[in-house]
């Protein structure tokens, strides 16, 4: 829904990568250079 968030973090869960990716590493954009459709 938020192009800004998807553009910057590309969070698979719809959450800002800057937050979850840094803490839990669940962000598909943080741990991986290219987020894979399907999660994990």
UniProtKB/Swiss-Prot annotation:
The compartments listed are: Secreted
> Which residue stretches belong to region Disordered?
1-40
- Give any single GO term for biological process: vasodilation
InterPro entries reported for this sequence: Natr_peptide, Natr_peptide_CS
State which residues form the propeptide: 1-8
Q: Name one GO molecular function term.
A: toxin activity
Annotated S-S bridges = 12-28
Alphabetically list the UniProt keywords.
Disulfide bond, Hypotensive agent, Secreted, Toxin, Vasoactive, Vasodilator
Describe its function: Snake venom natriuretic peptide that targets both NPR1 and NPR2. Exhibits hypotensive and vasodepressor activities.
Specify the protein name. Natriuretic peptide PpNP-a
């Amino acid at each position: 829904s938020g192009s800004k968030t998807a553009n910057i973090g590309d969070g698979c869960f719809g959450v800002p990568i800057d937050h979850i990716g840094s803490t839990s590493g669940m962000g598909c954009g943080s741990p991986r250079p290219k987020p894979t459709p399907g999660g994990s």
